[in-house]
Amino acid sequence: EDLQGTAVQERSAKASDEEEAIRTLLLTNVEFNRPFVLSIYDR
């Protein structure tokens, strides 16, 4: 039971790490793309 519980914890930790990485990537892309997005919406 302990082994299984540890495996589940590791899996959820890995998932949150990936979500964090994706979120960071998206935020970075938004910051980077803001001038382009603004120029598109400014038309």
From Swiss-Prot:
UniProt-annotated site: Reactive bond, residues: 23-24
Keywords annotated in UniProt: Acute phase, Glycoprotein, Protease inhibitor, Secreted, Serine protease inhibitor
GO biological process: acute-phase response
PROSITE patterns the record matches: SERPIN
GO molecular function, one term: serine-type endopeptidase inhibitor activity
Post-translational modification: N-glycosylated with carbohydrates having biantennary side chains.
Main subcellular location of this protein, as a coarse class: secreted
Subcellular location: Secreted
Tissues expressing this chain: Plasma.
A cellular-component GO term for this protein: extracellular region
Record-stated family: Belongs to the serpin family.
Domain description: The reactive center loop (RCL) extends out from the body of the protein and directs binding to the target protease. The protease cleaves the serpin at the reactive site within the RCL, establishing a covalent linkage between the serpin reactive site and the active site of the protease. The resulting inactive serpin-protease complex is highly stable.
Protein name in the entry: Alpha-1-antiproteinase 4
